[in-house]
A protein has these predicted regions:
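Acidic, mature catalytic/reactive cores of soluble proteins
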Residues: 1-319
Length: 319
Protein backbone atom coordinates (compact mmCIF):
# COMPACT_ATOMS: atom_id res chain seq x y z
CA UNK A 1 0.00 0.00 0.00
CA UNK A 2 2.84 2.41 0.79
CA UNK A 3 4.48 1.83 -2.58
CA UNK A 4 1.16 2.25 -4.39
CA UNK A 5 0.40 5.44 -2.45
CA UNK A 6 3.76 6.96 -3.30
CA UNK A 7 3.03 6.34 -6.97
CA UNK A 8 -0.59 7.52 -6.71
CA UNK A 9 -0.74 9.98 -3.78
CA UNK A 10 -4.41 10.77 -4.34
CA UNK A 11 -5.10 7.26 -3.06
CA UNK A 12 -3.88 7.91 0.50
CA UNK A 13 -7.27 9.10 1.72
CA UNK A 14 -9.07 6.07 0.31
CA UNK A 15 -6.50 3.73 1.83
CA UNK A 16 -6.91 5.32 5.26
CA UNK A 17 -10.69 5.18 4.95
CA UNK A 18 -10.67 1.50 3.99
CA UNK A 19 -8.39 0.70 6.90
CA UNK A 20 -10.23 2.72 9.55
CA UNK A 21 -13.67 1.64 8.35
CA UNK A 22 -12.61 -1.92 9.09
CA UNK A 23 -11.57 -1.32 12.71
CA UNK A 24 -13.97 -2.36 15.43
CA UNK A 25 -15.45 -0.40 18.33
CA UNK A 26 -13.15 -2.29 20.71
CA UNK A 27 -10.06 -1.22 18.76
CA UNK A 28 -9.12 -4.16 16.53
CA UNK A 29 -9.47 -5.18 12.90
CA UNK A 30 -10.94 -8.24 11.15
CA UNK A 31 -9.11 -11.02 9.38
CA UNK A 32 -9.23 -9.45 5.93
CA UNK A 33 -11.10 -7.18 3.50
CA UNK A 34 -12.50 -8.70 0.31
CA UNK A 35 -14.71 -7.51 -2.53
CA UNK A 36 -17.63 -8.63 -0.35
CA UNK A 37 -16.57 -6.39 2.54
CA UNK A 38 -14.82 -7.20 5.80
CA UNK A 39 -14.34 -10.85 6.69
CA UNK A 40 -13.51 -12.74 9.87
CA UNK A 41 -12.49 -16.25 10.82
CA UNK A 42 -15.26 -18.53 12.06
CA UNK A 43 -15.02 -21.12 14.81
CA UNK A 44 -15.86 -24.58 13.46
CA UNK A 45 -16.81 -26.82 16.42
CA UNK A 46 -15.80 -30.00 14.56
CA UNK A 47 -12.38 -28.65 13.52
CA UNK A 48 -9.83 -28.52 16.34
CA UNK A 49 -7.57 -26.37 14.13
CA UNK A 50 -10.11 -23.58 13.62
CA UNK A 51 -9.09 -20.49 15.54
CA UNK A 52 -9.96 -16.82 15.94
CA UNK A 53 -8.14 -13.77 17.27
CA UNK A 54 -6.75 -10.33 16.56
CA UNK A 55 -3.19 -9.56 15.46
CA UNK A 56 -1.84 -6.85 17.71
CA UNK A 57 0.28 -4.72 15.37
CA UNK A 58 -2.01 -3.88 12.44
CA UNK A 59 -4.09 -1.22 14.17
CA UNK A 60 -1.15 1.08 14.99
CA UNK A 61 1.84 0.44 12.77
CA UNK A 62 0.13 0.19 9.39
CA UNK A 63 -2.34 3.03 9.74
CA UNK A 64 0.38 5.31 11.13
CA UNK A 65 2.43 4.92 7.96
CA UNK A 66 -0.58 5.81 5.82
CA UNK A 67 -1.41 8.85 7.97
CA UNK A 68 2.16 10.14 7.83
CA UNK A 69 2.28 9.86 4.05
CA UNK A 70 -1.12 11.53 3.68
CA UNK A 71 -0.05 14.35 5.99
CA UNK A 72 3.03 14.92 3.84
CA UNK A 73 0.85 15.03 0.73
CA UNK A 74 -2.35 16.80 1.77
CA UNK A 75 -2.21 18.09 5.38
CA UNK A 76 -5.24 20.37 4.98
CA UNK A 77 -7.48 17.49 3.94
CA UNK A 78 -6.26 15.40 6.87
CA UNK A 79 -7.25 18.20 9.25
CA UNK A 80 -10.72 18.28 7.67
CA UNK A 81 -11.13 14.55 8.30
CA UNK A 82 -10.26 15.03 11.97
CA UNK A 83 -13.76 16.21 12.83
CA UNK A 84 -15.78 14.78 9.92
CA UNK A 85 -18.05 11.86 11.00
CA UNK A 86 -17.51 9.78 7.87
CA UNK A 87 -15.83 6.63 9.22
CA UNK A 88 -17.56 3.39 10.15
CA UNK A 89 -16.90 0.58 12.63
CA UNK A 90 -16.60 -3.10 11.73
CA UNK A 91 -19.18 -5.23 13.54
CA UNK A 92 -17.20 -8.39 14.27
CA UNK A 93 -18.92 -11.21 16.23
CA UNK A 94 -15.94 -11.61 18.57
CA UNK A 95 -16.42 -10.80 22.25
CA UNK A 96 -13.25 -10.20 24.25
CA UNK A 97 -13.70 -11.58 27.76
CA UNK A 98 -13.60 -9.67 31.05
CA UNK A 99 -10.25 -8.78 32.60
CA UNK A 100 -10.69 -11.41 35.31
CA UNK A 101 -11.21 -14.12 32.69
CA UNK A 102 -8.26 -12.86 30.62
CA UNK A 103 -5.98 -12.88 33.67
CA UNK A 104 -7.07 -16.42 34.55
CA UNK A 105 -6.29 -17.71 31.07
CA UNK A 106 -4.57 -15.14 28.79
CA UNK A 107 -4.36 -17.65 25.93
CA UNK A 108 -8.14 -18.04 25.65
CA UNK A 109 -9.63 -14.56 25.71
CA UNK A 110 -12.19 -14.25 22.91
CA UNK A 111 -15.61 -15.85 22.47
CA UNK A 112 -17.19 -16.28 19.05
CA UNK A 113 -20.79 -15.09 19.23
CA UNK A 114 -22.66 -17.44 16.88
CA UNK A 115 -25.98 -15.68 17.44
CA UNK A 116 -24.46 -12.31 16.58
CA UNK A 117 -22.74 -13.81 13.53
CA UNK A 118 -26.05 -15.15 12.21
CA UNK A 119 -27.74 -11.78 12.76
CA UNK A 120 -24.96 -10.05 10.82
CA UNK A 121 -25.31 -12.54 7.95
CA UNK A 122 -29.04 -11.79 7.83
CA UNK A 123 -28.22 -8.08 7.63
CA UNK A 124 -25.78 -8.80 4.79
CA UNK A 125 -28.60 -10.49 2.88
CA UNK A 126 -30.71 -7.38 3.44
CA UNK A 127 -28.16 -4.55 3.13
CA UNK A 128 -25.18 -6.03 1.33
CA UNK A 129 -21.67 -5.53 2.73
CA UNK A 130 -22.93 -2.64 4.91
CA UNK A 131 -24.55 -5.30 7.08
CA UNK A 132 -21.08 -6.16 8.40
CA UNK A 133 -20.70 -2.66 9.85
CA UNK A 134 -21.90 -1.28 13.17
CA UNK A 135 -25.41 0.05 12.64
CA UNK A 136 -27.84 2.27 14.50
CA UNK A 137 -31.20 0.91 15.67
CA UNK A 138 -32.70 2.23 12.43
CA UNK A 139 -30.12 0.19 10.46
CA UNK A 140 -28.12 3.22 9.33
CA UNK A 141 -24.32 3.01 9.44
CA UNK A 142 -22.93 4.50 12.66
CA UNK A 143 -20.30 7.12 11.81
CA UNK A 144 -17.36 8.56 13.73
CA UNK A 145 -14.68 11.14 12.98
CA UNK A 146 -10.95 10.58 12.59
CA UNK A 147 -10.25 11.79 16.13
CA UNK A 148 -12.51 9.14 17.65
CA UNK A 149 -11.15 6.36 15.47
CA UNK A 150 -7.56 7.16 16.43
CA UNK A 151 -8.50 7.51 20.10
CA UNK A 152 -10.18 4.09 20.18
CA UNK A 153 -7.12 2.45 18.62
CA UNK A 154 -4.84 4.22 21.11
CA UNK A 155 -6.87 3.39 24.22
CA UNK A 156 -7.15 -0.28 23.28
CA UNK A 157 -3.36 -0.52 23.34
CA UNK A 158 -2.83 1.72 26.39
CA UNK A 159 -5.25 -0.42 28.42
CA UNK A 160 -3.02 -3.44 27.72
CA UNK A 161 0.24 -1.69 28.61
CA UNK A 162 2.49 -3.43 31.15
CA UNK A 163 5.01 -0.98 32.72
CA UNK A 164 8.56 -1.98 31.85
CA UNK A 165 7.46 -4.78 29.53
CA UNK A 166 5.31 -3.51 26.64
CA UNK A 167 1.84 -4.10 25.21
CA UNK A 168 0.30 -7.37 26.39
CA UNK A 169 -0.45 -9.80 23.53
CA UNK A 170 -3.75 -11.12 24.88
CA UNK A 171 -6.04 -11.43 21.85
CA UNK A 172 -5.11 -14.98 20.78
CA UNK A 173 -2.79 -13.86 17.96
CA UNK A 174 0.82 -12.66 17.85
CA UNK A 175 2.37 -9.82 15.86
CA UNK A 176 3.97 -9.71 12.43
CA UNK A 177 3.87 -13.44 11.69
CA UNK A 178 3.17 -16.86 13.14
CA UNK A 179 6.79 -17.24 14.26
CA UNK A 180 5.70 -15.29 17.35
CA UNK A 181 2.84 -17.65 18.23
CA UNK A 182 4.54 -18.70 21.48
CA UNK A 183 4.16 -15.12 22.77
CA UNK A 184 0.37 -15.23 22.72
CA UNK A 185 -0.94 -14.66 26.24
CA UNK A 186 2.41 -14.60 28.01
CA UNK A 187 4.21 -12.09 25.82
CA UNK A 188 4.43 -8.32 25.53
CA UNK A 189 5.44 -6.19 22.56
CA UNK A 190 7.98 -3.43 22.79
CA UNK A 191 7.74 -3.09 19.00
CA UNK A 192 4.21 -1.74 19.41
CA UNK A 193 5.30 0.55 22.26
CA UNK A 194 7.88 2.16 19.96
CA UNK A 195 5.30 2.65 17.22
CA UNK A 196 2.52 3.63 19.61
CA UNK A 197 4.68 6.45 20.98
CA UNK A 198 5.28 7.67 17.42
CA UNK A 199 1.54 7.24 16.68
CA UNK A 200 0.53 9.27 19.75
CA UNK A 201 3.03 12.03 19.01
CA UNK A 202 1.59 12.27 15.49
CA UNK A 203 -1.93 12.31 16.97
CA UNK A 204 -0.97 15.08 19.43
CA UNK A 205 0.64 17.18 16.70
CA UNK A 206 -2.48 16.80 14.57
CA UNK A 207 -4.72 18.01 17.43
CA UNK A 208 -2.54 21.10 17.87
CA UNK A 209 -3.17 22.05 14.23
CA UNK A 210 -6.95 21.96 14.63
CA UNK A 211 -8.44 25.39 15.38
CA UNK A 212 -11.05 24.18 17.87
CA UNK A 213 -10.95 23.52 21.60
CA UNK A 214 -13.41 20.61 21.76
CA UNK A 215 -14.54 17.87 19.41
CA UNK A 216 -17.54 15.54 19.30
CA UNK A 217 -16.93 11.86 20.00
CA UNK A 218 -19.20 9.01 21.07
CA UNK A 219 -20.28 9.25 24.71
CA UNK A 220 -19.08 5.74 25.50
CA UNK A 221 -15.61 6.50 24.10
CA UNK A 222 -15.49 9.76 26.08
CA UNK A 223 -16.38 7.97 29.33
CA UNK A 224 -13.72 5.34 28.57
CA UNK A 225 -11.13 8.04 27.92
CA UNK A 226 -12.06 9.91 31.10
CA UNK A 227 -11.60 6.78 33.22
CA UNK A 228 -8.25 5.97 31.60
CA UNK A 229 -7.08 9.59 31.94
CA UNK A 230 -8.07 9.72 35.62
CA UNK A 231 -6.33 6.41 36.37
CA UNK A 232 -3.25 7.41 34.39
CA UNK A 233 -2.95 10.53 36.55
CA UNK A 234 -3.03 8.28 39.63
CA UNK A 235 0.01 6.37 38.33
CA UNK A 236 1.72 9.43 36.88
CA UNK A 237 4.75 9.28 39.18
CA UNK A 238 5.42 5.54 39.32
CA UNK A 239 9.02 4.52 38.68
CA UNK A 240 9.02 1.86 35.97
CA UNK A 241 12.52 0.70 36.98
CA UNK A 242 11.68 -0.02 40.62
CA UNK A 243 7.96 -0.85 40.46
CA UNK A 244 7.08 -4.00 42.42
CA UNK A 245 5.25 -6.93 40.85
CA UNK A 246 2.27 -6.18 43.10
CA UNK A 247 2.08 -2.55 41.92
CA UNK A 248 2.63 -3.59 38.31
CA UNK A 249 -0.29 -6.02 38.53
CA UNK A 250 -2.40 -3.32 40.19
CA UNK A 251 -1.60 -1.01 37.26
CA UNK A 252 -2.44 -3.65 34.65
CA UNK A 253 -5.67 -4.73 36.34
CA UNK A 254 -6.87 -1.13 36.80
CA UNK A 255 -6.69 -0.39 33.08
CA UNK A 256 -7.79 -3.88 32.11
CA UNK A 257 -11.00 -3.53 34.12
CA UNK A 258 -11.70 -0.09 32.61
CA UNK A 259 -11.33 -1.55 29.12
CA UNK A 260 -13.54 -4.50 30.08
CA UNK A 261 -16.30 -2.18 31.32
CA UNK A 262 -16.22 -0.25 28.05
CA UNK A 263 -16.40 -3.43 25.99
CA UNK A 264 -19.33 -4.73 28.01
CA UNK A 265 -21.29 -1.54 27.26
CA UNK A 266 -20.67 -1.47 23.53
CA UNK A 267 -21.18 -5.21 23.07
CA UNK A 268 -24.60 -4.88 24.69
CA UNK A 269 -25.85 -1.53 23.43
CA UNK A 270 -23.42 -0.04 20.91
CA UNK A 271 -23.04 3.73 20.94
CA UNK A 272 -25.73 6.15 22.11
CA UNK A 273 -24.92 9.82 21.50
CA UNK A 274 -21.94 12.17 21.23
CA UNK A 275 -20.30 14.54 23.69
CA UNK A 276 -17.45 17.06 23.61
CA UNK A 277 -13.86 16.02 24.25
CA UNK A 278 -11.36 18.70 25.28
CA UNK A 279 -8.36 18.61 22.94
CA UNK A 280 -6.20 20.23 25.62
CA UNK A 281 -7.07 17.36 27.95
CA UNK A 282 -6.26 14.87 25.19
CA UNK A 283 -2.86 16.47 24.53
CA UNK A 284 -2.00 16.45 28.24
CA UNK A 285 -2.96 12.79 28.47
CA UNK A 286 -0.80 11.89 25.47
CA UNK A 287 2.19 13.66 27.04
CA UNK A 288 1.73 11.71 30.28
CA UNK A 289 1.52 8.28 28.67
CA UNK A 290 4.44 9.04 26.33
CA UNK A 291 6.57 9.91 29.37
CA UNK A 292 5.73 6.49 30.79
CA UNK A 293 6.63 4.85 27.49
CA UNK A 294 10.00 6.64 27.57
CA UNK A 295 10.81 4.97 30.90
CA UNK A 296 9.91 1.55 29.55
CA UNK A 297 11.93 2.17 26.39
CA UNK A 298 15.02 2.98 28.47
CA UNK A 299 14.55 -0.22 30.47
CA UNK A 300 14.52 -2.18 27.21
CA UNK A 301 17.68 -0.59 25.82
CA UNK A 302 20.69 -2.90 25.75
CA UNK A 303 24.34 -1.94 26.14
CA UNK A 304 25.00 -3.29 22.65
CA UNK A 305 22.92 -0.43 21.26
CA UNK A 306 19.86 -2.52 20.45
CA UNK A 307 16.34 -2.34 21.85
CA UNK A 308 14.37 -5.38 22.99
CA UNK A 309 11.50 -6.31 20.67
CA UNK A 310 9.46 -8.63 22.93
CA UNK A 311 9.32 -9.75 26.55
CA UNK A 312 7.59 -12.57 28.41
CA UNK A 313 5.42 -12.02 31.47
CA UNK A 314 3.66 -14.14 34.07
CA UNK A 315 0.22 -12.88 35.08
CA UNK A 316 -0.73 -14.03 38.58
CA UNK A 317 -4.49 -13.61 38.81
CA UNK A 318 -4.47 -13.90 42.61
CA UNK A 319 -3.25 -10.29 42.70
Amino acid sequence: WEALGLSYPNCWESMISIFLNATSADGYNPYRITSYGIDWEIIEPDDSWSHIGYWNDHQIIYVLKLLEHFNNTNPERLKQLFGDPIFSYANIPYKIKSFKEIANNPKKTIDFDFEDHNKIMDLVDELGSDGRLLLTKSKDIYHANLCEKLLVLSLAKICNYVPGAGIWLNTQRPEWNDANNALVGNGTSMVTVYYLKRFLEFFKKLTSQIRIDNIDISLEVLLWFNEVEKTMFKYKNINHSTISDQDRMDYVSSFGKIFGNYRKKIYSNGFSTSKKLSLNKLRSFISTICNQFDETILINYSKNGLFDAYNTINIDSKY
